[in-house]
Design a protein with these regions (language model features):
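Conserved catalytic/binding loops enriched for acidic/polar residues
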Residues: 460-817
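The catalytic-center signature of Zn2+-dependent metalloproteases
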Residues: 352-375, 437-494
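Auxiliary tRNA-acceptor-end handling modules of aminoacyl-tRNA synthetases
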Residues: 27-320, 338, 342, 347, ...
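Solvent-exposed, polar/charged alpha-helical surfaces in well-ordered, non-transmembrane soluble domains
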Residues: 326-333, 337, 437, 441, ...
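Hydrophobic helical h-region of N-terminal Sec-dependent signal peptides
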Residues: 14-19
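Bacterial N-terminal signal peptides that target proteins for export
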Residues: 2-13
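C-terminal motif of bacterial Sec signal peptides marking the signal peptidase cleavage site
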Residues: 21-24
Length: 817
């Protein structure tokens, strides 16, 4: 195409950037711009130097030395672009090490608009809308004015050859990409504070390249900041990173959205639709999903499996170690079976990226391509983020990240959770095939997120504990009805149960097939999202009575004992009992299993510390029964309650278990053969810390408030606050006196003092509740018992009693009734 300048405008300085934000990058073949001679004698020469290099794409990108211009076709003025900012190269430990190469730092919808001799860049929001032709649309627009992020002078007008020719405007965007624009710099306010970022050093910052593609523009920039506390090389006082800005043209016609339903788990976008006749400003939720359309709609309508017009493709990071590549690919493509439930075959693919010889312009930062990135980082994590069109929920792109050191997490947990029954997990390094299978399932979990699925924490509770010990069941069904649960390894299977290798691991389950079908199956007879609702609702009701198809969202403080993290099975007490039995078998073997000739005891110390944490986690699963409330998600046309308190008998059983396994001294954790190899001491504090955590969870104000409220409704059928306080006191004080038991008794008094003196905690008004009154009452009775101890006690016991009496008196005097 030729650029035909119509009229060059007086060159003005680039208008002030009003705030901060982003823009994109891209790539195709470079060529010198070909300019026709001006037809108008008054026309000035083009502002573009003859030496400028041009990339042709969604719009033209011109580059000369450190200057950058965008030539935007007039039809694209007013169109919506999605700008994605991503770290391309990063110093180690940026933001604590979580911000690896490929990490998305921002996304926003932008719109270019021409006003007179300037082009404005606006940030556009779709949070408030009015669908249809309702007159309120005018009010929505007037009350949701989009901010102007930057303004650019029109440097030149031109035309692109065509029939008819396309008018264009030329703007210089150099400053936008070379200055410190906070929203596209990759450094959040918290990171700037942490690393004491002072200013951008322009002399060490520059544009790497800019490329145009048919749908997007990509700009790569190197930014160097003066920083008082850089993440690495502190003496340099310098923080440098490479950012990639992707600006992709969104479809002119958005994908048909699908409305969310809280009974099926999906990541969602929320919008307030003022056009609905709901007698209120009604909130709508759209699920986030990829655009999957059948290549043969007629065959699809007949119920045949068909390929999608465009499959979902993830490319493997070229930096992925060779021995793990096949496992990563399998983790991606394991979702193919779930999409067959939605009527699609070969819907999800994993591919190697093209070589430089095959496609010199291919880039993993190009927003058109999704990747599974392998981050060389000490962080132990993985994640599956995605970028979506806020108008419809259509997922545009996703970069899954596996942090290299996450191998360490699974190496350790396979040994601790399965080593008792799994010979492949009894030495370091762990069997490579077993670790590869674990990697495969983690990748599948993160792909699930990238497909639109959130965590489903209730899924593991649908499997009976006994079934998890059955090799045939475990081999077919895994450990949970959904791979989106935090249920990683089968820790309940016992030696002799017969499970082998991958039988101990999770896998894509029946809920995942159901959720993918619910979100991705095309409903041919529906013409609008509203038309889909009765069909979607019928699919939910058809599964409503089967626990395998329940959804339980992840929360910071779950009250449903079935919706815990890292738990297994339908009986927390039994599952935790079996898990602890396995840990008791593993603990004395750690010295042998972690031994390596010529090495120290670093692995032993690490594994022992994580074993203690795993035991604490199992005990926490049981705590959740106390004051627990089952939550069964329903719509108004379904019978029954949503919230049901856990039966009294189950709560009493849980407290009895905790009295035996948590509040009694866990002597099995005190093996001197291990402790004297990793520590000079500190066992008493270690045990006290573990027991105190369980004690605090049991006597959590929100939990205690639920007990008070449950007694109001159920009376004698409820497990009461008075009963819990009595049961805990009996467990803590009815044991032989040792440094361990005395430490727990002090913790018990401290917790009661806290309940008796704090005004509020965790949203609970302690000052006016029965919790405070009963805590004070129990402290007073405890004081009487301590003061009535017989004479002749050992000095340490007498001192212990006197100390606790003094603590109680001080608390009650400082905060009298």
């Amino acid at each position: 195409m030729k650029i035909v300048p119509l009229r060059s405008l007086p060159t003005l300085a680039l208008a002030t950037l009003l705030t901060a934000l982003a823009t994109g990058c891209a790539s195709t073949e470079k060529k010198d711009p070909v300019l026709d001679e001006p037809a108008d004698d008054d026309a000035q020469e083009s502002v573009l130097p003859e030496e400028a290099e041009t990339d042709e794409g969604v719009f033209h990108v011109h580059r000369h030395e450190e200057q950058l211009w965008f030539e935007i076709p007039a039809p694209l003025l007013g169109r919506d672009f999605l700008l994605v900012s991503r770290i391309a190269r990063t110093p180690s430990d940026l933001g604590g090490g979580f911000f690896a190469a490929g990490h998305k730092t921002g996304e926003q919808v932008l719109r270019w608009e021409r006003v007179g001799e300037r082009v404005l860049l606006r940030k556009v929001s779709f949070r408030n809308v009015a669908t249809g032709d309702d007159p309120i649309q005018v009010s929505v627009e007037n009350n949701n004015f989009h901010p102007i992020l930057a303004a650019f002078d029109v440097e030149e007008e031109g035309k692109l050859e065509g029939d008819p020719p396309t008018e264009t405007v030329l703007i210089e965007v150099t400053d936008f990409f070379s200055k410190d624009i906070a929203a596209i710099s990759g450094l959040s306010a918290s990171m700037r504070k942490t690393h004491e970022v002072k200013r951008l050093d322009a002399s060490r910052s520059f544009l790497n390249h800019a490329h145009a593609y048919p749908e997007n523009v990509e700009v790569r920039q190197t930014l160097t900041f003066e920083a008082g506390n850089p993440p690495t090389d502190a003496a340099t006082k310098t923080l440098s990173l490479e950012m990639n800005q992707s600006m992709i043209l969104l479809p002119e016609e958005p994908m048909r959205p699908r409305f969310a339903d809280h009974r099926v788990g999906w990541f969602t976008l929320q919008r307030t639709n003022y056009g609905l006749d709901a007698q209120k400003s009604a909130t709508e939720e759209l699920i986030r999903r990829w655009r999957l359309e059948p290549s043969d709609p007629e065959a699809y309508a007949r119920g045949e499996l068909v390929t999608p017009v465009e499959p979902i493709v993830w490319y493997l990071d070229p930096g992925t170690p060779a021995k793990w590549r096949s496992w990563v690919k399998r983790g991606v493509e394991d979702w193919q079976a779930a999409f067959e439930s939605a009527g699609f075959k070969d819907a999800v693919l994993a591919k190697d990226p093209p070589t430089k010889e095959e496609d010199p312009d291919w880039s993993g930062e190009d927003v058109r391509y999704s990747m599974v990135r392998w981050a060389a980082s000490e962080v132990r994590n993985a994640m599956g983020p995605s970028v979506s069109d806020p108008r419809s929920g259509e997922i545009i792109e996703s970069d899954i990240v596996w942090y290299h050191n996450h191998m360490r997490s699974y190496r350790n947990r396979l040994m601790l959770e399965t080593g008792a029954a799994n010979p492949l997990a009894r030495s370091l390094p762990i069997d490579e095939e077993l670790l590869g299978e674990a990697l495969r399932q983690v990748i599948a979990h993160e792909v699930g997120h990238a497909l639109g699925l959130p965590h489903n924490m209730i899924a593991s509770a649908s499997y009976p504990v006994a079934s998890l010990r059955d090799p045939a069941f475990a081999r077919k069904m895994g450990v949970s009805a959904s791979i989106m649960d935090y249920a990683r390894q089968n820790y309940v299977a016992q030696p002799g149960d017969g499970l082998e290798g991958a039988d101990f691991l999770r896998r894509i389950g029946p809920y995942d097939h159901y959720a993918i079908e619910w979100g991705y199956r095309v409903i041919p007879e529906a013409e609008t999202p509203e038309d889909e609702k009765p069909v979607l609702d019928a699919w939910i009701l058809a599964k409503a009575d089967d626990p395998m198809y329940r959804f339980g969202a992840q929360t910071s403080s779950p009250t449903d004992p079935r919706s815990q993290t890292e738990d297994l099975g339908d009986d927390p007490v039994l599952a935790s009992s079996l898990g602890l039995q396995n840990l008791e078998r593993v603990a004395p073997k750690l010295l042998e299993w972690t031994a390596s000739e010529g090495e120290g005891y670093g692995d032993l110390e690490e594994l022992y510390g994580e074993l203690v944490g795993q035991a604490r986690r199992y005990l926490g699963h049981v705590v959740s029964l106390v004051g627990g409330v089952y939550e069964d998600l329903k719509a108004t046309d379904q019978e029954g309650r949503v919230f049901t308190p856990v039966p009294k008998e189950e709560q009493q059983r849980a407290v009895a278990f905790l009295a035996e396994r948590a509040l009694a001294t866990p002597t099995w954790l005190l093996d001197p053969e291990i402790l004297r190899r990793i520590s000079r001491g500190g066992e008493v504090d270690r045990v006290r810390s573990m027991q105190t955590r369980i004690l605090h969870q049991l006597l959590d104000p929100a939990r205690l408030r639920r007990l008070v409220e449950d007694e109001l409704e159920r009376g004698e059928e409820a497990y009461t606050l008075t009963e819990l306080l009595a049961d805990v006191q009996n467990a803590v004080w009815s044991v032989p006196s040792t440094p361990y038991s005395r430490g727990l008794q002090r913790a018990h008094v401290e917790r009661l003092v806290w309940l008796a003196t704090e005004e509020s905690a965790g949203g609970v008004d302690l000052d006016t509740s029965d919790i405070r009154a009963l805590a004070r009452w129990q402290l007073e009775r405890m004081k009487e018992l301590l003061e009535s101890q017989p004479d002749g006690l050992a000095p340490v016991l007498e001192a212990h009693a006197a100390d606790l009496v003094a603590r109680i008196e001080h608390a009650l005097e400082e905060r009298p009734d």
